[in-house]
Amino acid sequence: MIERNWNELIRPEKPQIETGADATRKARIVAEPLERGFGVTLGNALRRVLLSSLQGAAVTAIQIDGVVHEFSSLEGVREDVVDIVLNIKQLAVRMHAEGPKRMTLRATGPGVVTAGQIETPSDIEILNPDHVLCTLDDGASVRMEFTVNTGKGYVPADKNRPEDAPIGLIAVDALYSPVKRVAYRVEPTRQGQSLDYDKLILEVETNGAVTPVDAVAYAARILQDQLQIFITFEEPKAKTADEAKPELPFNPALLKKVDELELSVRSANCLKNDNIVYIGDLIQKTEAEMLRTPNFGRKSLNEIKEVLAGMGLHLGMDVPNWPPENIEDLAKKFEDQI
């Protein structure tokens, strides 16, 4: 059946989120377990989409009173216009409406001029208000007007210059992406007794316009939407009530293999040597029978009793008609209940 192609792949659990002092800007997102190779596949795809395809806002042009072109200088302003433009490129902006929009800055020296002094409309936020734009000497003043727009990716300055641009308008390279940095790494992780699975660790930093967790969610949604066109078959129909899973005469947890329990190597090897494969095999053993197992001591016995107790089980239980026929097929069918 075609659905086995995806249904039989292991699915990761809900991602673990680790944040620092500022959860709105930095986070580490961990997804495990993944099939071997899927860590790199998903990590690389998410990284590329995060850096290139998320919508954001940026300054696209500026006008400074008394400045005709970007190679000018302003009296009483310590930075030249080129440096001011470089500082403006680093403004972090959030827009709650479609652009373009205008912002204005008026400042008088002496002192440092920061992004927090910019006058913005109600639908624009400056996310790094302490960012320095320029420094004014005593008696100096400056007035700037900024054009802000929304978009994605990187747009060079020449694309931001309108054909009817007035004299003195300086187009700016726009980096719209709210994501500043993405790094990922893949480590081996355990599933049962096997280490042949991937753990994906994503480290995401944004400018605050979107949280790292939301950014990853949006990137995943973009990938989902783009990949949808390649699904050219109809999904198998859901099973009818007559085809539904039969009721088991015992706890489905008994179908779980003992090598998936978090046991010490010594205990796991003793069970393996005694041909105990499923939990259903294990719980029918008495304590005396277990202690007769070669190399199996009281410490291993207590460990197993503690693990079983956590599942509501114990040694010496009676399970009629065990083992069932086609036990491996039953284990797959009731995998979600194990």
From Swiss-Prot:
EC number assigned by the record: 2.7.7.6
Enzyme class, first EC level, given as a word: transferase
Protein name according to UniProt: DNA-directed RNA polymerase subunit alpha
Family assignment from sequence similarity: Belongs to the RNA polymerase alpha chain family.
Alphabetic keyword roster: DNA-directed RNA polymerase, Nucleotidyltransferase, Transcription, Transferase
Coiled-coil parts of chain: none
InterPro entries in the cross-refs: DNA-dir_RNA_pol_insert, DNA-dir_RNA_pol_RpoA/D/Rpb3, DNA-dir_RpoA, RBP11-like, RNAP_asu_C, RNApol_insert_sf
Any GO BP: DNA-templated transcription
Function comment: DNA-dependent RNA polymerase catalyzes the transcription of DNA into RNA using the four ribonucleoside triphosphates as substrates.
